[in-house]
Amino acid sequence: MAEEFITPVYCTGVSAQVQKQRAKELGLGRHENAIKYLGQDYEQLRVHCLQRGALFRDEAFPPVPQSLGFKELGPNSSKTYGIKWKRPTELFSNPQFIVDGATRTDICQGALGDCWLLAAIASLTLNDTLLHRVVPHGQSFQDGYAGIFHFQLWQFGEWVDVVVDDLLPTKDGKLVFVHSAQGNEFWSALLEKAYAKVNGSYEALSGGSTSEGFEDFTGGVTEWYELRKAPSDLYNIILKALERGSLLGCSIDISSILDMEAVTFKKLVKGHAYSVTGAKQVNYQGQMVNLIRMRNPWGEVEWTGAWSDGSSEWNGVDPYMREQLRVKMEDGEFWMSFRDFMREFTRLEICNLTPDALKSQRFRNWNTTLYEGTWRRGSTAGGCRNYPATFWVNPQFKIRLEETDDPDPDDYGGRESGCSFLLALMQKHRRRERRFGRDMETIGFAVYEVPPELMGQPAVHLKRDFFLSNASRARSEQFINLREVSTRFRLPPGEYVVVPSTFEPNKEGDFVLRFFSEKSAGTQELDDQVQANLPDEQVLSEEEIDENFKSLFRQLAGEDMEISVKELRTILNRIISKHKDLRTTGFSLESCRSMVNLMDRDGNGKLGLVEFNILWNRIRNYLSIFRKFDLDKSGSMSAYEMRMAIEFAGFKLNKKLYELIITRYSEPDLAVDFDNFVCCLVRLETMFRFFKTLDTDLDGVVTFDLFKWLQLTMFA
């Protein structure tokens, strides 16, 4: 078969945002109605290729060096020398998608540091229902084969259907990355390729935590346990988690980069992700021993201590039980005692699929809510509580807890009643941005109790003074540079505000905040309503204007008694040059043109006496505000000082408008000069007053025809 080149067409920029919002409203993004990633429709593409007798080649993730990586696996790397992209049909005469069902031994690590991902895939094979949510049925290298396959992944709140071709990186006729112990089986290699596609390259998968894979295969939420301070009932927690299909992974921390994948005396690998695949209590010489089953994604290098493959402890176990536990040699899977597990490993990750309350003795479905947000320099990226001047500008979300948890049958009055909930903060698309030198930011969140005087109020973004005088009630266990930070809380009924942030201010990123509660709870994103509290503007007739001002105007305007754009620029720059305390490069011709257009009521492109009088009074007012909020007296305002100044001037704006304002009016260092400040406030005030004039029925809605819209936007 020839190869078929099909270039996908999909929306970008603003049109993509509009399309995404419409898709959500239509229910797209649920697993049963997954979004077609990059607009690629698996069935349409497959049929298209079959009709033309051509094998699919994916130009959205082509078989080229850039798809391998950008640094260690970049186009000029020695590690990629000799790599050839080949289809399984070129490697084997009888390639198979899945042989005798998917099993843990189908996943063996190759020359890529994505053991965390492979540990997650291995855990996925323990639950056939979960597996086939990710790996759809009906795919093969025989019936209907067209060189195209697809997989479904959870990506930041929505399920996407990802199409790949079956051209895989090989060297000397063997797969370079993940492969199956069953040589001619390819589902795991193709799933790895789909995951590499959504993250931009294979190299982007290097290094990570198993929880990432867990969540992207299930849409669940992961909890972490530091084994040095684990709860006393952790083994029971593990048993329950495995029983209800949760995915589990564990690892050994490293103290230095030299320890990475170092092998211990008893053949455990440091800094390496293992999957937990089973747990069992066995009778050993009359005593019950807790065992735990692990798997190394390498497919080899196994624990050699007590209860390892072939160890003497197995001789003391009933032969039937020994056979049930299927002790095998060198398949990467092994048993060890839970006591040794606690001593040898550092961290355990459990991905709750529902999620369920693992600390409870019975299953409980949690109520879930998901919010998407952004951190933007100068507007919504305020950093953590260590930065009180900017912390308040971070996005804020309110939680209203009303119903307390059901009584715990194992609790004998030792705990006060409270409301359990779990918060999970996830940063988006950071792996995909690695090729641009960006990696995971250090993230976390704080939870504040709303004081009685503010309870029940509509969405109001809490300001700086609140956080200066109130301590957090709870917070994430740590700020850490992982994709997700999650923490379980139990707080009394009441209203609380969650503030997610990066550790340092001005670190940009997109995030998802997920909220899970055992009982129903109200949640909402806090954002100020857009409004302006402006005094009635006194518009004087020419006769009422002060004679001294008239005299000044005659000198400035010249014979035609009107001020042009160039004349306005000369006037304003002459004035501000006398104020040595102001940092400014002067008003540009474009900014003066914008002011004239906004203030020009008769449409002649110039300002008459009355129009100039209005502008003059506004600028004098803006100058006093500017000086008031130039807190460090630097001659300019920071983006955050400007936000307070705008509010003092009478404007309440939401996060999106502040983002736009900072993007348009601040310098690269986020400083706002006086001229930009004036241009911003002139525009805001004029547009608010203009809208108020048109909103005759005071319903907050104005309808424009195309001509009016163009007229407004062209002159704004």
Curated annotation (Swiss-Prot):
Site note Cleavage applies to S15, A16, G27, L28
* Modifications the protein undergoes after translation, according to the UniProt entry: Undergoes calcium-induced successive autoproteolytic cleavages that generate a membrane-bound 78 kDa active form and an intracellular 75 kDa active form. Calpastatin reduces with high efficiency the transition from 78 kDa to 75 kDa calpain forms.
Where Phosphothreonine occurs, residue numbers? Answer: T354
Which residues are Ca(2+) 3-binding? Answer: D600, D602, N604, K606, E611
Q: GO molecular function: any one?
A: peptidase activity
Q: Signal peptide span per the entry?
A: none
Q: Provide the Gene Ontology terms for cellular component.
A: cytoplasm; cytosol; plasma membrane
Q: Which residues bind Ca(2+) 1?
A: Q109, D114
Give the note describing cofactor binding and stoichiometry: Binds 4 Ca(2+) ions.
Q: Which residue ranges does the record assign to the EF-hand domain?
A: 543-578, 587-620, 617-652, 682-716
Name the family: Belongs to the peptidase C2 family.
Q: Under what name is this protein listed?
A: Calpain-1 catalytic subunit
Q: Which gene encodes it?
A: CAPN1
